């Protein structure tokens, strides 16, 4: 469940991205499996290339068999994207052998497996990362998985990417080079850049500010402060708050117009003059509020632009609360489907 809930959090931002054509995944364990599976379930039709990078080719082979043939894996996985595997349900469920299980179907992009043992690994790694639109780092590597310069030089910065680093969980381990984080939090200057680059957000998105500042190797070694990281939950609340303000603003305009009509009909001349002054003051105050809200809306649009198209880095160290939430939902689903056994007063 830990790998599943970690991938759920990572893909919250991934599913909103404008471009997810080229997905790169480092690793071939449970974390990699769930990140790939959820990515395909959420945006599979938009993913054109899936590149899996791992030291052991056989582990990637096993991951793909489990992914595309969950009931009975074939002896040899066919990497041809035109090949559509069939699935078998458990015996006794009334389905004919070989009939495709629609509940297990996953879109099939073009899949490439890359291992460091390949003779042209450096060149292929460079090309794969440069073309990537999303990178999931799902290993326990103590050192960066690739040189920072691939993404930090002018050519590497042209394309906006979503990077999720979820494997390293100690201050001394870094899957992602700290220089990439430093560049991502660097302030944007008002003047035009000689080299065009994707929007930087000025912050790294994390699951927990306190824990990442102490435990996440990438964050610690990049020397980031509290003002340079933002919790993913806060981004969700900002969106909800912006939506609420817009609704309140529209409701306020309606109430103001209604008040003017009532005052004009029911009040005497003297009271009307007093009311007009109040309404003028109210309108002036409303205009100030509107200007304030316009500024907030621009900031909100800029935030959305960054999250959807810019360079976004998400770092996770794991939260126990997510285990409780996901576990509760799994129990609820099991109850609804009458699966498993409940032990009362356990």
What are the functions of these language-model segments?
Residues 21-22, 47-50, 111, 159-161, ...:
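Residue-level recognition of the N-termini of beta-strands and the immediately preceding loop/turn
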Residues 42-111:
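NAD(P)-binding Rossmann-fold cofactor-contacting core
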Residues 169-346:
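Adenosine-phosphate binding glycine-rich loop
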Residues 10, 17-43, 48-59:
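Glycine-rich adenosine-cofactor-binding loop
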Residues 11-16, 328-332:
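Short glycine/serine- and small hydrophobic-enriched flexible loop segments
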Residues 91-95, 105-219:
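Rossmann-like adenosine-cofactor binding region
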Residues 1-14:
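A glycine-rich, Thr/Ser-enriched phosphate-binding loop motif common to dinucleotide/cofactor-binding enzymes
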């Amino acid at each position: 469940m830990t790998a599943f809930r970690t991938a759920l959090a990572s893909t919250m931002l991934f599913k909103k991205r404008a471009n997810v054509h080229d997905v790169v995944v480092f690793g071939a364990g449970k974390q990699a499996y769930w990140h790939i599976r959820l990515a395909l379930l959420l945006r599979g039709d938009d993913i054109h290339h899936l590149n899996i990078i791992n030291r052991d080719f056989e582990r990637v082979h096993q991951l793909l068999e489990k992914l595309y043939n969950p009931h009975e894996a074939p002896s040899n996985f066919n990497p041809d994207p035109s090949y559509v595997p069939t699935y078998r349900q458990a015996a006794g469920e009334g389905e004919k052998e070989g009939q495709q299980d629609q509940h297990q179907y996953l879109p099939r992009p073009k899949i490439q497996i890359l291992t460091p043992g390949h003779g042209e690994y450096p060149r292929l790694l460079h090309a794969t990362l440069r073309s990537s639109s999303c990178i999931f780092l799902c290993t326990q590597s103590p050192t960066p998985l690739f040189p920072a310069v691939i993404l930090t030089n002018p050519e590497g910065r042209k394309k906006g990417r979503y990077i999720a680093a979820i494997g390293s969980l100690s201050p001394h381990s870094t899957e992602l080079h700290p220089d990439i984080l430093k560049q991502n939090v660097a302030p944007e200057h008002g003047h035009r850049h000689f080299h065009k680059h994707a929007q930087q957000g000025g912050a790294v998105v994390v699951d927990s500010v306190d824990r990442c500042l102490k435990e996440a190797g990438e964050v610690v070694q990049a020397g980031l402060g509290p003002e340079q990281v933002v919790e993913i939950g806060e981004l969700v609340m900002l969106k909800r708050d912006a939506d609420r303000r817009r609704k309140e603003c529209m409701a306020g305009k309606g109430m103001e117009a209604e008040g003017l009509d009532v005052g004009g009909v029911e009040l005497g001349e003297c009271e009307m003059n007093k009311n007009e002054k109040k309404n003028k003051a109210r309108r002036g105050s409303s205009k100030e509020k509107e200007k304030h809200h316009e500024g907030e809306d621009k900031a909100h649009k800029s935030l959305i632009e960054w999250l959807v198209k810019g360079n976004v880095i998400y770092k996770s160290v794991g939260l126990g609360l997510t285990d409780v939430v996901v576990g509760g939902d799994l129990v609820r689903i099991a109850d609804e489907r009458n699966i498993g056994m409940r032990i009362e007063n356990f």
